UniProtKB/Swiss-Prot annotation:
GO molecular function, one term: ferredoxin-NADP+ reductase activity
Gene3D superfamilies: FAD/NAD(P)-binding domain
Organism: Chlorobium luteolum (strain DSM 273 / BCRC 81028 / 2530)
Enzyme class name: oxidoreductase
Protein name: Ferredoxin--NADP reductase
Highest taxon, organism lineage: Bacteria
EC number: 1.18.1.2
Assigned protein family: Belongs to the ferredoxin--NADP reductase type 2 family.
Record text on cofactor binding: Binds 1 FAD per subunit.
Residues that span the membrane, as ranges: none
Catalytic activity reported: 2 reduced [2Fe-2S]-[ferredoxin] + NADP(+) + H(+) = 2 oxidized [2Fe-2S]-[ferredoxin] + NADPH
Residues that hold FAD according to the record: 22, 41, 49, 54, 94, 129, 295, 336
Cofactor(s) needed: FAD
Pfam families, sorted: Pyr_redox_2
Length: 350
């Protein structure tokens, strides 16, 4: 491991708020640019939503990975980054920041801990998120993570079960296909008359329906559930034309999206656009020395995918150098050259 260089006063160069793919890659870019950093992540593990909600979901649109499990992508990003030894603070939520007289930034967490750095990078995704629920089902919290789920964290939870999936977007379609051969039976319910997910996956779902591998109910909503104590037994469906039906179910998988909330970040006085932080072409916010990258950053033409977040991270770290080390000439070093030098140095010190 190449330990990061810390200034004589012990203050790190950059604090990265958020430990998802964007935040992890930002830490790697710090290492590539010879600046020290820390990641502060509110969850108990790195990876953001990929670790918390979709560890077994496969991702197909990250360059260089024809197909990769979400957890595998997080592992690869960290393996790439850990050589630089960034400080990682888990289970801490940053609630406020203050720009000090000397231009440094101090952040405060919900538990009262404070951290100081030369600059600040927001990589907090969409902020805090909570799953959308079906109000007609009332309080189903006692069933959550037992028979009602909002994400697939472990396929074994659905093995040999009668699974009803609600939703018509990418996650619902992906797991309809992904749980075939795992669940005893898969039933997909969507309130619209057509799917909103990726066309290729939608065609796979249509083909599975035609072959009898799954059941699909369009223009249909879940109206109620049957319980035996605290055990799910069945789901009641109601079509738009009023026709009702009952489907046996051991598991109800609600994949109808998440509600995001910037939380305390919304009160930081930053310029906001559509619940995201506005940045310029250098990923700088309206506050000098404070940058944003990934889903939390907004600029014209922004595409909210992992690949874009990684690019944002590289751009933000690169341009943060002008604030962290004012007056110094920024030199670009190709990764192949830098790694060759580091490996040579490691070999000499072994």
């Amino acid at each position: 491991m190449t330990l990061q260089r810390v200034s004589p006063d012990g203050i790190l160069d950059l604090t990265i708020i958020g430990g998802g793919p964007t935040g992890i890659f930002a830490a790697f870019q710090c290492g590539m640019n010879n600046i020290s950093c820390r990641i502060i992540e509110s969850m108990p593990q790195l990876g953001g939503q990929l670790s918390a909600l979709y560890p077994e979901k496969h991702i197909y649109d990250v360059a260089g990975f024809p197909e990769v499990p979400a957890a595998g992508l997080v592992d690869s990003l960290w393996k790439q980054t850990e050589r630089y030894g960034p400080e990682v603070i888990l289970g801490e939520t940053v609630i406020s920041y203050r720009k000090l007289e000397n231009g440094d930034f101090q952040v405060v967490t919900a538990s009262g801990r404070t951290f100081v750095s030369r600059a600040l990078l927001l990589a907090a995704g969409l902020g805090a998120f909570s799953p959308r629920k079906l109000p007609q089902l009332g309080n189903i919290s006692p069933l959550e993570d037992r028979s009602v789920f909002y994400a697939v964290k472990n396929r074994a939870d659905f093995r040999d079960k009668n699974v009803v999936i609600v939703g018509g977007g990418d996650s619902a379609l992906d797991w309809t296909v992904g749980l075939m051969g795992v669940a005893r039976k898969v039933t997909l319910v969507h309130r619209m008359h057509e799917f909103q997910g990726h066309g290729k996956t939608a065609r796979e779902v249509d083909e599975a329906k035609e072959s009898g591998a799954i059941d699909v109910h369009l223009s249909t909503e879940v109206s109620a559930i049957d319980l035996n104590g605290d055990t799910l037994q069945a789901v009641h469906l109601k079509r738009r034309d009023g026709i009702t039906s009952r489907v046996e179910a051991d598991r109800l998988l609600l994949l109808i999206g998440f509600k995001s909330n910037l939380g305390p970040l919304a009160d930081w006085g930053l310029e906001l656009v559509d619940n995201a932080v506005e940045v310029d072409g250098h990923m700088k916010t309206s506050v000098d020395g404070l940058y944003a990258a990934g889903d939390i950053a907004s600029y014209p033409g922004k595409l909210k995918i992992i690949q874009t977040g990684l690019s944002d991270a590289a751009m933000a770290v690169r341009h943060s150098l002008t604030y962290i080390k004012p007056g110094e000439k920024i030199r670009h070093t190709f990764s192949s050259v830098k790694m060759a030098k580091e490996k040579k140095s490691e070999g000499q010190n072994a």
